[in-house]
């Protein structure tokens, strides 16, 4: 009999030497308040939550602080450099986050275009090289380009985070073959980031064999964020199981599920 809990315990996501039972990473933005962030995060089962260091208070104890709501013994705070448009800004933000949180994990974002929020790959690569040399565990947000993904692996990044679609668009996965090419090109974890709209999007991404998925808007802006968080939890597990189970080949024509031999009325 299949034991789901045992499977999840043994099928862990490993990034930078740290193990995570959940392959779902969630964001902390766009919720109505920190209490809702807490409830949705716990409902999702995620063990990592991203925080935009330049936008969310994690340092000033005199103001409402996200860290007062998240149990950091169970859920890791993954700072990101959202809002940065140059390598220099991103590097400074990462250093501030390390000082505040006491660890060197960082989701590296260097945006190149305000309309699409696509990453500036040149600036991102420049920042990643410096941060890796300074001992950070770098998870860069990148375009779905396998050549660039390999370059980030070569300079020592702990994972790559290619987009499924523009941030907050809810369009779902637009270029599945590009994600497959990235998965083939690198040995580090591939975490699909941005563009997820609903649970089926998450399942489809995971069915490709990627190592995890990160989302924020899909949960935070849902009509009921808590229910959507639960849906995403199960969608990610379902997609992972489907990938490991192995889907049947696609065929143009029908294939009867029951044998034709011995059918009544036929010789």
Swiss-Prot record:
Q: GO cellular component terms?
A: cytoplasm
The primary site where this protein sits is cytoplasm
| Entry's EC annotation | 2.8.1.10
Record-annotated active site: 107 (schiff-base intermediate with dxp)
Which family would the database say this protein is a member of? Belongs to the ThiG family.
GO annotation, biological process? thiamine diphosphate biosynthetic process
Q: What is this protein called?
A: Thiazole synthase
Q: Which SUPFAM superfamilies match?
A: ThiG-like (SSF110399)
UniProt GO molecular function: thiazole synthase activity
* Keywords of the record: Cytoplasm, Schiff base, Thiamine biosynthesis, Transferase
Catalytic activity, reaction form: [ThiS sulfur-carrier protein]-C-terminal-Gly-aminoethanethioate + 2-iminoacetate + 1-deoxy-D-xylulose 5-phosphate = [ThiS sulfur-carrier protein]-C-terminal Gly-Gly + 2-[(2R,5Z)-2-carboxy-4-methylthiazol-5(2H)-ylidene]ethyl phosphate + 2 H2O + H(+)
For this protein's source organism, the top of the classification is:
Bacteria, Pseudomonadati, Aquificota, Aquificia, Aquificales
State whether it acts alone or in a complex, and with which partners, per the record: Homotetramer. Forms heterodimers with either ThiH or ThiS.
Protein species of origin: Sulfurihydrogenibium sp. (strain YO3AOP1)
Which positions in this protein are listed as binding 1-deoxy-D-xylulose 5-phosphate?
Answer: 168, 194-195, 216-217
Known function? Catalyzes the rearrangement of 1-deoxy-D-xylulose 5-phosphate (DXP) to produce the thiazole phosphate moiety of thiamine. Sulfur is provided by the thiocarboxylate moiety of the carrier protein ThiS. In vitro, sulfur can be provided by H(2)S.
Gene name for this UniProt entry: thiG
| SS bond partners | none
| Cytoplasm listed as a keyword | yes
Q: Hey, which pathway is this one from? A: Cofactor biosynthesis; thiamine diphosphate biosynthesis
Asked if Transmembrane is a keyword of the record, the answer is: no
Query: What InterPro entries does the record tag this protein with?
Result: Aldolase_TIM, Thiazole_synthase_ThiG, ThiG
């Amino acid at each position: 009999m299949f034991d789901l809990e045992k499977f999840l315990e043994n099928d862990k996501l490993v990034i930078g030497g740290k193990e995570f039972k959940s392959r779902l990473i969630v964001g902390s933005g766009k919720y109505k308040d920190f209490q809702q962030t807490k409830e949705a995060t716990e409902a999702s089962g995620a063990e990592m939550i991203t925080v935009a260091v330049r936008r969310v208070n994690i340092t000033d104890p005199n103001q409402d602080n996200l860290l007062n709501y998240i149990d950091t013994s169970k859920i890791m705070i993954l700072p990101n450099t959202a809002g940065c448009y140059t390598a220099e800004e991103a590097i400074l933000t990462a250093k501030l986050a390390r000082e505040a949180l006491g660890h060197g994990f960082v989701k590296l974002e260097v945006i190149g275009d305000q309309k699409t929020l696509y990453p500036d790959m040149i600036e991102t690569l420049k920042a990643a090289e410096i941060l890796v040399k300074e001992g950070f565990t770098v998870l860069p947000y990148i375009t779905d380009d396998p050549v660039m993904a390999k370059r980030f692996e070569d300079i020592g990044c702990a994972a790559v985070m290619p987009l499924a679609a523009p941030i907050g668009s809810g369009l779902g996965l637009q270029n599945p073959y590009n994600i497959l090419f990235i998965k083939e090109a690198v040995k580090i974890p591939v975490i699909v980031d941005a563009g997820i709209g609903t649970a089926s999007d998450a399942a489809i991404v995971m069915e490709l064999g990627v190592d995890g998925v990160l989302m924020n808007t899909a949960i935070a802006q849902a009509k009921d964020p808590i229910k959507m968080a639960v849906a995403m939890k199960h969608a990610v597990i379902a997609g992972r199981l489907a990938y490991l189970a192995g889907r049947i080949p696609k065929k143009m024509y029908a294939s009867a599920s029951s044998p034709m031999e011995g059918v009544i009325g036929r010789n």
